[in-house]
Amino acid sequence: MRGVYLLLLMVGRDLKIRIGSLGVVEFKRGYYVYVGSGQRYLEKRIQRHKKKIKRVKWHIDYLTTNSDVRVIEAAAY
């Protein structure tokens, strides 16, 4: 499958996370939507984003591996 996907994330408390070359980024408690794209295997990409333990490969991984962040829902288009 080729296209875009959306992740609905819940940040459980205010956080400051170092995100690769972006440096420290502040996230307020609440809901966020991440928009990603892929040439194929979107369902596998979504499943990977839902895992807490993984090699940090993309900027979103710095957020999704945090214990105070949950992927609530995901959709691929």
Task: Report the location of each language-model feature.
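Conserved helicase motor core of SF1/SF2 NTP-dependent helicases
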Residues: 1-2
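A short beta-strand micro-motif
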Residues: 5-10
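Aromatic/basic micro-patches that form nucleic-acid/chromatin recognition or nuclease catalytic surfaces
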Residues: 12, 39-77
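Short N-terminal binding/cap micro-motifs at the start of the first secondary-structure element
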Residues: 14-18
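Short secondary-structure capping micro-motifs at structural edges
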Residues: 19-24, 60-61
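Non-catalytic terminal regions with compositionally biased, polar/charged low complexity
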Residues: 28-29
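GIY-YIG nuclease signature motif recognition
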Residues: 33-38
